[in-house]
């Protein structure tokens, strides 16, 4: 009887020890550090973070919440080593709170320190942009415009070159035909001159 009870007690202790070890491993996973909001737009943002070296992290979980609103958005991704995540479908001029957690095989880490940020209005973004500031998108558009202009210029030059070449060819043909035309004119003029008498004298009209 005591043998059965003793075996059951040993199994119970082993099970409790396993649960305790799992909870310790999960608790030993540190919360993400240096949580930062970057590339803040009116309807999107990018959250970045760091982890302690040596933490067996296999993914992350992000909790996004509007300030003073209970509704949450939960983003989770595993089998990744990325340290950033895009937040989308945000509302302009709205405050949000973000927490980040690391995920390991044993569970999740405690949440990071909350990060509060506010999305700007589109008008504020345009006003804050200096006249000399040039974005990569604008640079790309300018490059496309320049490429289009160059293509048009090249096409026009090729067309003009073709027209000039055709004109030169026609001019050469006309110039080559001029001696033949002169010969024909001289021949025609000689045939139309005053005919000579068969005996060698010129025909004269009788008075």
Curated annotation (Swiss-Prot):
Basic and acidic residues bias: start-end ranges: 178-188
Gene3D superfamilies, sorted: Immunoglobulins
Intervals, Extracellular compartment: 27-146
Residues in the signal sequence: 1-26
InterPro entries per the UniProt record, alphabetical: FN3_dom, FN3_sf, FNDC5_C, FNDC_type_III_4/5, Ig-like_fold
Places the protein is found: Cell membrane; Peroxisome membrane
Record's bilayer topology term: Single-pass type I membrane protein
Motif, Microbody targeting signal: chain positions: 205-207
Keyword Secreted attributed: yes
Renumbered residue ranges of the record's region Disordered: 178-207
GO function term, MF aspect, one: hormone activity
Glycosylation sites: 34, 79
Record flagged with keyword Transmembrane: yes
Residue ranges of the TM segments: 147-167
Domain Fibronectin type-III: residue ranges: 31-122
Major subcellular location class: membrane
Keyword set, alphabetical order: Cell membrane, Glycoprotein, Hormone, Membrane, Peroxisome, Secreted, Signal, Transmembrane, Transmembrane helix
SUPFAM superfamilies attached to this UniProt entry: Fibronectin type III
GO CC terms, sorted: extracellular region; peroxisomal membrane; plasma membrane
Residue ranges annotated as Cytoplasmic topological domain: 168-207
PROSITE patterns per UniProt: FN3
Domain notes: Fibronectin type-III domain is capable of forming a continuous intersubunit beta-sheet dimer; dimerization may thereby play a role in cell-cell adhesion or signaling.
Identification of the protein by name: Fibronectin type III domain-containing protein 5b
